[in-house]
Regions:
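Conserved acetyl-CoA-binding loop-helix of GNAT-fold acetyltransferases
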Residues: 122, 128-145, 153
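Conserved catalytic-core motifs of GNAT/GCN5-like acyltransferases
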Residues: 152-154, 163, 168-191
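A conserved beta-strand-loop-helix scaffold within acyl/acetyltransferase catalytic domains
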Residues: 78-122
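Short beta-strand-to-coil "C-cap" segments at the C-terminal boundary of structured domains/repeats
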Residues: 193-196
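Short acidic/polar active-site loop segments enriched in Thr and Asp
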Residues: 17, 149, 168
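C-terminal catalytic "cap/lid" subdomain
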Residues: 1-78, 82-83, 128
């Protein structure tokens, strides 16, 4: 295996973008490597495949694909393409090899020195790998950079996840006045806040 890895590294050092080591004993290994996102072999690249970054207009379709199942099951509030396009500058994403696996948005309320962390989504196949924590750190960093002293979330299902990360429950009337006006009392979302 060491020999093959060194050959792959040499290939990448000489301009090959990606080189693969495939198990010869698996029938159809080449097809699985090409057509399944995670593949079946070992890939050596001369670049970072995973990135945490701010979203751009090119990411709107990927964000919609990611959040749509969670909107349908009621975990997330429905967002239209137009809303995401309008607010794209608020979103941060985790992508792997061009596919968006997680996202979150920061909606600042500067008059109250707080911001809402919204649309927090990690794809089921990526859950448990730390992408949610990466996004939380990014949102906290962005909030600090613009002078916010806290962030808050509204959640109906993930309260325990946020509490484990330093959030505490507060009543809905804690929300900034502008956010209270939009609060959907029928959803019965829990309001959690974290001081930065």
């Amino acid at each position: 295996t060491g020999y093959y890895l060194s050959r792959c590294i040499t290939a990448c050092e000489h301009g090959v973008e990606r080189s693969h080591i495939l198990p010869f004993a698996v029938d159809g290994a080449l097809l699985l490597e090409i057509y399944v996102h995670d593949g079946i072999g070992t890939m050596v690249v001369d670049e970072k495949l995973e990135s945490l970054r701010e979203a751009t207009a090119d990411d709107v379709a990927g964000i919609l694909r990611l959040i749509e199942p969670f909107e349908q099951d009621g975990t997330l509030v429905k967002r239209s393409r137009t809303e995401i396009e309008r607010d794209i500058g608020n979103y941060s994403i985790v992508e792997h090899d061009g596919v968006i696996f997680a996202c979150a948005a920061l909606y600042p309320y500067p008059e109250a020195k707080t911001g809402e962390m919204a649309a927090v989504t990690v794809s089921p196949q990526s859950q448990g790998q730390g992408d949610g924590d990466k996004l939380l750190r990014r949102i906290e960093q962005r909030a600090r950079e613009i002078g916010l002293g806290s962030i808050f979330v509204l959640t109906t299902r993930a309260m325990h996840w946020f509490i484990k990360r330093g959030f505490r429950q507060v009543p809905p009337d804690w929300l900034p006045e502008a956010r209270i006006r939009k609060y959907n009392w029928d959803r019965k979302s829990q309001v959690l806040v974290k001081q930065l």
